[in-house]
Amino acid sequence: MCGIIGYVGLDDAKKELLKGLQALEYRGYDSAGIAYCQPNGIKTIKTVGKVSCLKDKVAKEAADDVTTCGIGHTRWATHGGVSDTNSHPHTAGKVTLIHNGIIENYKELQEELAAKGKEPISQTDTEIAAMVIDDCYTGDPEAAIRKAISKLVGAYGFCIIFSDIPETIYAVRNGSPLVAAHTDRGSIIASDMVALVSHTKHYFVLKEGHIAKLTKDEIIVKDENGEVYGPYIHHISWDMASAKKGGYDYFMMKEIHEQPEALRNTIRPRMVNGLPDFSADGVGDELFTDVNRIVITACGTAMHSGLMGKNMIERLCRIPVTVDIASEFRYQNPIIDEHTLLITVSQSGETADTLAALRLAKERGAKTLSVVNVKGSSIARESDYVLYTHAGPEIAVASTKAYSVQVAVMYLIAFRFALVNGKISEKDAVGFMKTMIDTVDKVEDALTYDQQTERIAKRLTSATDIFFLGRGLDYALSCEGSLKLKEISYIHSEAYAAGELKHGTISLITDNVPVIALATQPDVYAKIISNVQEVRSRGAKVILITGADASVDAALCDYHIVLPETDPLFAPFVATVILQYLAYYVSVEKGLNVDQPRNLAKSVTVE
């Protein structure tokens, strides 16, 4: 969740650290700080607020400082409140470190340190970790780190500098990701490759338990046994321009408009002779045989793509599919075995709960397939098979294009699974693929609905509650629409299967409560219209979204959005844009920061 950057090289470390922290701002944070080497020790500057506040403080307090080695951090408070004292970096004795993660046994460690007369200054688990490393330090940094992490329980990504070993950064991780690169200007390490891309196109992922030593001349990585290890080098396929707004006010709007390209990039490489095909991904048909049950596990938006996948896979493949919240999966003693296919979905590939679910499934012998956007991520590496979504970098906290391509991959899995197991013919599969790629043109058409949805959004900003209704595929999409709205507009919102109205939900419907109803599926159209009539009769303000061929009584709704003509099976791809627009414009109208909603982080790397 937090942002980490470390630099040692030929250039001004303060400048490089601040630049890196600015690149990591999209992850969400409440304070920021840097620490860097000086002739008389380590100097630390940190503050509550944005990186711009830190930049001003550095300019005021350290304009003349010359340094070529340092570490920087953006903090999202987990242990201890938001304050300068609790901000990172933290120092204990000769150790200064930054940390992404949560140390679960920090209280026990704090008690052990207190018995030695050592007390923390802050309220954070991170300072305890620094104190433990310093307590273990007798002049050999790698030995101290190795001994200290043997005492830690939890997730962590540490970057560490020792005051008596200048111009050197040490790093180690467990759970929380770290990526690093060496160039002719020095070495850099970060929690996210977006902080590296201005330096290089090549990087490696630090493995769990491995210790990296960064100097201006090289990076040396040692495994758990202290043996030097040569990491696999990955290539970044996008550039810094892709991670900039490109003329849009917010990244979210830019990323909404990038969906057609992302969908084509995800679908077309998996079309061979018109058929769905994963051979280029190294995913053979053996994955889809001898499977009697599929479990999809994910968090948030990724889980909603799983709901879409469940609907399509069960519809076409006639095999039972469950969708489990990853944070619950491990604790319910799931029923999985060698005939289970576990599909994990994660944009970052580092979502802690999803990674834990994957590891449990592998322990129990399940086949595992991951759907991720980031190459070389932990979930991708640890899965038996991986299907990459080709969304490119997604900077806004609220996911848009990553969701759409996740749904696209779910559809592709359904098509291939059904074809391999004889549930659909090749002719059917070709038809599905053609319609799917044609639907991308309809997604582009939906992008022209911005003014219409903006006008409607302006009527929703004063609402305290907004409800979404749908059935089947529309219900699955309603869940995502509701999440998108609440996370960036701060308006309470819930999505309901429309048939559940009579079972309690309808008691919440009063005069002028907005209800957004999705009615794109002909097989349940009459039912959803009946539900709309129910809320309408109780005074709801109804926004109705339908297909092009739907016949709608004008008195049934306050606003009617008619989608471009689309095959109903693929209508959710088009309707997704409308729901994203509504959430975006409500947030903008309220004057909120669309890209960085409060209390949220882009990548949740702690449980």
What are these regions (language model features)?
Residues 1-245, 249, 261-292, 331, ...:
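Conserved short alpha-helical segments that host acidic/polar catalytic motifs at enzyme active sites
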Residues 7-10, 99, 119, 135-138, ...:
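Hydrophobic alpha-helical scaffolding
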Residues 259-263, 267-295, 385-514, 587-607:
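Active-site phosphate/pyrophosphate-binding segments
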Residues 4, 36, 160, 171, ...:
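Structural beta-sheet core signal
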Residues 68-85, 272-286, 309-345, 492-508:
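Glycine-rich oxoanion-binding loops at beta->alpha junctions
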Residues 226, 541, 556, 566-607:
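Generic C-terminus detector
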Residues 289-438, 518-564, 582:
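Glycine-rich phosphate-binding loops that contact phosphosugars or nucleotide phosphates
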